[in-house]
Amino acid sequence: MRTLRFLLSARHLSPRAKGIPVLQTLGHKAQRPMTCSLHTSQPPGPPQTTSSAGSVAPYEDVFKKEQRNKSNFVEVLDLYCKRDTRRRGHVEIIETALRWMPEFGVEKDLEVYNKLLDVFPKEIFIPQNFIQRMFNHYPRQQECAIRVLEQMEHYGITPNKQTCFLLLQIFGDRSHPIKKYQRMMYWFPRFKYTNPFPVPAELPADPVELSRMCLHRIAADLDSRVAVHQMPYTEKCDDGKEQEHLHIVGIQSPSQVSLLAAHDPSTPVYVEGPFPLWLKKTCVYYYILRADPDPMENEEEIDNERSFYYPLSLDIQLDRDLGDDDSFDVDDVVEGPVFAMCMAGSGDERLLGKWIRGLQETNPILGQTPVVFRLNSGPQELSVPQEKEAQPKQEVEEEEREPERHRMEQ
């Protein structure tokens, strides 16, 4: 009923219901002739991009590989902190910076990590009452700070007092990032010196010094001596081209020299490799000179139970005393005795042949012993077979297209 009353009242208020013509209500606008015209226009084209100073551009296009360094990385963080005092989008900025730190070479810089934590607004995420302390207050910001500490833990970076001061100023003393910081400070000093053979923080850039350090790490005998058989140098040929000669560094101990002197000259020795050795993120390769195990030294293994009830052999050194000096024993391996090791610039037989000729000065028996090279495809030779495999594929595709060409000609 109410809707019906509203309709009746609206009808009485309309100009037609009162007997007033519609043209008079329009006034002078009704005197204009009403015409209908057809207007055609071209459809709008695609939006044109205008290069302005305020346009957004991704950082990967702004910074080239030569410009990706610590100073530019810190400059971006400073520009963001000065632009907005409220630090809107600080979580996204920090997470993006964590992903790009290896590209800028600052993934092991403690100062940069403290700079990332300084991006957080101060004294905003600290809980003010017991209810906020019960729950995870500002969980996204706390998880972001924990990710920063986890990346520091991944690269083995120990936090300092400035890191603790920033976390206290941002999240308070009972937050999850502070607990993560306390766990890191508890375990990091305990595991810092567990490795008896620590790798230096900066590896030597000289390949000869790097090979010398690596061979000393591989060799178990402290009496082993390193010999540089060839230094890297470049030589100009008669035709004007430059020929590069790579380095050869070898190592051999006195016990290995005596083992090689007692080797049968009729039995060949083998040069095998390359074998990888990782020093942090750097991978180097070494080669060994070895022989097959002596079949006369293979002893029959005694069963454990038979040896327990009826001992057939006892390995007891009765002549030893507590005052005897312990010396390094020769390790008997299943593959056979290892006589020497070396590191070379490439796995070429010609280059390794120079190493064998250098060993003949201290091991004259090598001049009478046949040497067999058992070399695998090294890292420098991996790209060559891929190019060779691509050529037969093109030939096969051309052979498959030949019948189609004959059909088209017919």
From Swiss-Prot:
Q: Which InterPro entries match?
A: ECIST_C, ECSIT, ECSIT_N, TPR-like_helical_dom_sf
**Mitochondrion among the record's keywords?**
yes
* Comp. bias (Basic and acidic residues): 386-395
Tell me which residues form the transit peptide: 1-33
Keywords, sorted A to Z: Cytoplasm, Immunity, Innate immunity, Mitochondrion, Nucleus, Transit peptide
Subcellular location(s) per record: Cytoplasm; Nucleus; Mitochondrion
Q: Which GO terms describe its cellular component?
A: cytoplasm; mitochondrion; nucleus
Q: Where is this region: Disordered?
A: 35-56, 377-410
Q: One matching Pfam family, short form?
A: ECSIT_C
Function, please? Answer: Adapter protein of the Toll-like and IL-1 receptor signaling pathway that is involved in the activation of NF-kappa-B.
The UniProt family comment states: Belongs to the ECSIT family.
* Name of the featured protein: Evolutionarily conserved signaling intermediate in Toll pathway, mitochondrial
Which source organism does the UniProt entry give? Xenopus laevis
